[in-house]
Curated annotation (Swiss-Prot):
The protein's enzyme class: oxidoreductase
Cellular component terms per the entry's GO annotation: extracellular exosome; sarcoplasm
Modified residues (Phosphothreonine): T68
Protein name as it appears in the record: Myoglobin
Quaternary context: Monomeric.
Record keyword Cytoplasm present: yes
EC number, UniProt record: 1.7.-.-, 1.11.1.-
GO biological process, one term: removal of superoxide radicals
Every Globin domain range: 2-148
Keywords linked to the UniProt accession: Cytoplasm, Heme, Iron, Metal-binding, Muscle protein, Oxidoreductase, Oxygen transport, Phosphoprotein, Transport
Intracellular or extracellular location(s): Cytoplasm, Sarcoplasm
Gene Ontology MF terms in the entry: heme binding; metal ion binding; nitrite reductase activity; oxygen binding; oxygen carrier activity; peroxidase activity
Length: 154
């Protein structure tokens, strides 16, 4: 799967808006993930105790983790598909230490699309959404291949 230059332009254009408030976007994305798929919360010892959206919004740890997640994803997106070096340690930790199923990466991808659309409706139309979906699908496909190399069937 390959994105065109025009698709990468759309992806990186919206990502520039994310970078204006990485922690805030990350927090919103994690809250969206946890609300939509509460089972994902069980993978996070630091956040298991957070039961309400208000508790999640008040959590500095959640905000910090959202920043970490989106900083890593931004680094991957900026490589425009040439993300082998960035992907390897991420796949290693998510497969062997955290045991995060690929399905959960689909869930967070959906949360990313949802939050970007709700925060930036004028800048995240159908073309940009399709491009971001394609970029996130490429990421998931490549991380799934790494999982397989590591013997994790997540």
């Amino acid at each position: 799967m390959v994105l065109t230059d025009a698709e990468w332009h759309l992806v990186l254009n919206i990502w520039a808006k994310v970078e204006a408030d990485v922690a805030g976007h990350g927090q919103d994305i994690l809250i969206s993930l946890f609300k939509g798929h509460p089972e994902t919360l069980e993978k996070f010892d630091k956040f298991k105790h957070l039961k309400t959206e208000a508790e999640m919004k008040a959590s500095e740890d959640l905000k910090k983790h959202g920043n970490t997640v989106l900083t890593a994803l931004g680094g991957i997106l900026k490589k425009k598909g040439h993300h082998e070096a960035e992907l390897k340690p991420l796949a290693q930790s998510h497969a062997t230490k955290h045991k995060i199923p690929i399905k959960y990466l689909e869930f967070i991808s959906d949360a990313i699309i949802h939050v970007l659309h709700s925060r930036h409706p004028a800048d995240f139309g159908a073309d940009a959404q399709a491009a971001m979906n394609k970029a996130l699908e490429l990421f998931r496909k490549d991380i799934a291949a790494k999982y397989k190399e590591l013997g994790f069937q997540g």
